[in-house]
Amino acid sequence: MSGSQLWAAVLLLLVLQSAQGVYIKYHGFQVQLESVKKLNELEEKQMSDPQQQKSGLLPDVCYNPALPLDLQPVCASQEAASTFKALRTIATDECELCINVACTGC
């Protein structure tokens, strides 16, 4: 294999890896990291706009049509609020996502 073929193979692997995205698994739910980031944005907007806040059993974000599809099944859970909180915590912890090679268990 020549040097240019090796570089092409490495580049292809990097592109494929980044295209797959990062997934978070928690209590039977599997969601994309990008979806959790979108969840944070939606919740921040709802906190700043009292008209978007609902009083119900579900977290307010469950009523938002912009909620990513992979997060919508969480709203059917009785523990939706605590699940969203856990997902946000995991998404901000580099060791949970195995981004930092110094973390153990990755």
From Swiss-Prot:
Primary residence: secreted
GO CC annotation, single: extracellular region
Disulphide connectivity of cysteines: 62-75, 95-103, 98-106
Proregion residues excised on maturation: 22-91
Entry's Gene Ontology BP terms: adipose tissue development; body fluid secretion; cGMP-mediated signaling; energy homeostasis; glucose homeostasis; multicellular organism growth; negative regulation of blood pressure; reduction of food intake in response to dietary excess
N-terminal signal peptide: 1-21
Gene3D superfamilies per UniProt: Guanylin
Record key words, sorted: Disulfide bond, Secreted, Signal
KW Secreted (keyword) present: yes
Tissue: Expressed not only in the gastrointestinal tract but also in the lung, pancreas and kidney.
InterPro entries recorded: Guanylin, Guanylin_sf
Subcellular location: Secreted
Domain of life, source organism: Eukaryota
Keyword Ribonucleoprotein appears in the UniProt entry: no
PANTHER family (alphabetical): GUANYLATE CYCLASE ACTIVATOR 2B, GUANYLIN FAMILY MEMBER
Family: Belongs to the guanylin family.
Role played: Endogenous activator of intestinal guanylate cyclase. It stimulates this enzyme through the same receptor binding region as the heat-stable enterotoxins. May be a potent physiological regulator of intestinal fluid and electrolyte transport. May be an autocrine/paracrine regulator of intestinal salt and water transport.
Name recorded for this polypeptide: Guanylate cyclase activator 2B
Organism: Rattus norvegicus
Source species taxonomy: Eukaryota, Metazoa, Chordata, Craniata, Vertebrata
